[in-house]
Amino acid sequence: MLRSAATFPLLRVFTLTLVVLGCGCAGTGPGTGAPVHYRFFDPPDSNDIWTPTIRGWQSRERALTDTELLRPTEASLGARVSEGGGATIGSGGTHGDLRAEYFAFRAERKRALARDVAAWIQSEARHHYIPNGPIARWATLEETLANNGASCNGLELLPNRFLLDAGFRPDEVYRAIVMRPSDGQHHMVTLWFENPDDPWVIDPTGAMTTGMPHLSEVAGWVPVKVFSEYVEYTVHPDTVAPGSLAIRQAR
């Protein structure tokens, strides 16, 4: 088939374009195509130009001993934030105070993660719950995983340890023994003290509650002990504020 003379320049341009594009894609990265390896943790040289700036920031950042010291007041956070709402948006669709928005977002994400953990362990418990024998021996996390399950004493360690591994503070996440006064039944749950007076409850098996309610929302059970790997507290009714837990003073 014959082509007109005008067709050949167009074909040449089209062909050159494909070649250029093809070379551009294939030519990214090192010439050999081999992956680049880095040593990420070498000490800086004595004359490194970044060192003074980095060390100046490190010194100022270490002066803040606890991020919670930056937390705004509940009044500035607003009712939506304290009840689990999102960031506050000002008039005209503009965002409000960055400090309030940061802590509101952080609280919202932590609650969402904790609720996911509660839903997950309550689902897994249906397949991995192993009743206690004649003598109850509390399993460690290692033993619970090795045995592919445990009673509430072992299963509770999974959400508890997950929250700690995910960055929740060790002074806000505790194991707790709860008791049902109607029949003396005891149970193990995780308490997350986002609110020091009314913690969230994560029940691994659903024997006490499902989801992640506040302790004040769970009827028929009372906390007896609060503890971790390193500390142990006994829970008493707070005579200063009836109905709240007397644990803040013991920390």
Set out the residue ranges of the language-model regions.
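A structural boundary/capping signal
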Residues: C25-R251
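Bacterial N-terminal signal peptides that target proteins for export
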Residues: M1-F14
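Secreted/extracellular small peptides and ectodomain modules produced from precursors
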Residues: M1-L2, L21-C23, A150
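Bacterial N-terminal signal peptides
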Residues: R12-C23
